[in-house]
Amino acid sequence: METFDTNVLVRLVVQDDADQCARAERSWRSAVRSSGVFLPVVALVELVWVLRVAYKLDRASVAATLRRLISSEGVTLERKDVLHAALDRYAAGLADFSDYVILETGRSVGAVPLRTFDARLAQTAEVELVP
């Protein structure tokens, strides 16, 4: 199995640099054919940030892009349960994807509520503002 860095994932989904896109696609296809692709949580959190901040994609587009990527053939996810739950919350919520990953990681080990200073995130069940 091969791990792909955020910058390669960006090229795969944004398609904004012809040379790097072609190289990324060849590498991805090769990995899928041979041993598969591993996507770490942090790479996907970074990908969402890049798509939102650098490419100005809206929440719905980012969520759809991430769903396509993580459901691709040959992909293995770190903490699949956490990522799917965080993505569901992100698609319907107000907070950042990274916040929902933190929440769902805590939930997965029974560590709730999540304490935060983020008022948007605090509108989520199992999240409380620090008084």
Annotate each PLM feature.
Residues 1, 103-131:
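Acidic, PIN/NYN-like endoribonuclease modules and their adjacent C-terminal/linker elements
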Residues 1-39, 54-61, 67, 131:
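Short, well-structured N-terminal submotif of metal-dependent ribonuclease cores
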Residues 11-13, 50, 124-125:
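Residues that scaffold the ATP/ADP-binding catalytic core of kinase and kinase-like folds
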Residues 13, 28-29, 70, 84-87, ...:
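Regular secondary-structure segments
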Residues 33-34, 72, 93, 124:
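Structured helix-beta-strand junction loops
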Residues 48-52, 67, 87:
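Amphipathic alpha-helical segments within well-ordered protein domains
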Residues 74-115:
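Active-site neighborhoods of divalent-metal-dependent phosphate/nucleic-acid chemistry enzymes
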